Amino acid sequence: MIRAYVKLKLQTGLRRTDLLGLTKSHVTPDCLTVTLSKTQKKTGKVLEFEMTPELREVIVECNAILPLSPYLFKTRKGESYLKEDKTANGFTSIWQRWQNKMPEDKQFAERSIRNYVGHQGDEQGASEILGDSIETTRKHYRSNVTKVKPLSSSSRATKP
C-alpha cells in the first residue's frame, strides 16, 4: 500500500490529505479529478490529472489492495485513513514503520515527496501539477536556490 501511495504522490504531488481522501469516484477513464482540500472552501480549485498508462497502473494497484472499499488507500477494515478532523495517525504509524525498515541514509519524510515534485521541470509545470501559483511554488519549493555571481579577479578587493 505504501509503495502505491509513493508512486501516486510522485506522479501527482498531492498533499497527504488529498491522497488519503481519494475514492474510486474520483477516477474516470479519462482522468483523476481532485478538489484540493487546502483551498476547497476558498477557491474550490480542482485538478484533473490526465489518465496516463502510469497513472492507470498505480490506480489499478490501489484498487487491488484488499479489502474492497471505495477508498484507494484504506485500513484493514476498508475505511479511510483520513479522519474527519483531517488527521491520519494510522497512516503516519504505517509510514514510520516502513521508514524504520530502511537504512537510515535512505529514510525520508512523507512530505518531502511533494517537495521533490515541486523541484521537477520548469516552474510553470511544477506549479500546475502542485495546484499552486508560480509565486507559491517559487517560495516553498524553489526558495533554497540563490543565484550568485562569482567574484572576478577585477572585482576582488585589494589588501589595505
Residue spans for each PLM region:
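Beta-strand residues in well-ordered beta-sheet regions across diverse protein folds
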Residues: 33-35
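Short, basic (Lys/Arg/His-rich) helix/loop patches that form interaction surfaces
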Residues: 2-3, 12, 49, 66-68, ...
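C-terminal catalytic core of Y-nucleophile DNA break-rejoin enzymes
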Residues: 40-61, 69-97
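DNA/chromatin major-groove-contacting recognition/catalytic segments
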Residues: 47-50, 61, 128-129, 138-160
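Basic, Lys/Arg- and aromatic-enriched nucleic-acid-binding interface segment
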Residues: 1-16, 20
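Catalytic core segments in nucleotide and nucleic-acid processing enzymes
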Residues: 24
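Conserved catalytic core of the tyrosine transesterase superfamily
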Residues: 1-7, 27, 31, 40-41, ...
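Phosphate-coordinating loops and pocket residues in cytosolic domains that bind phosphorylated ligands
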Residues: 21, 29, 139-143
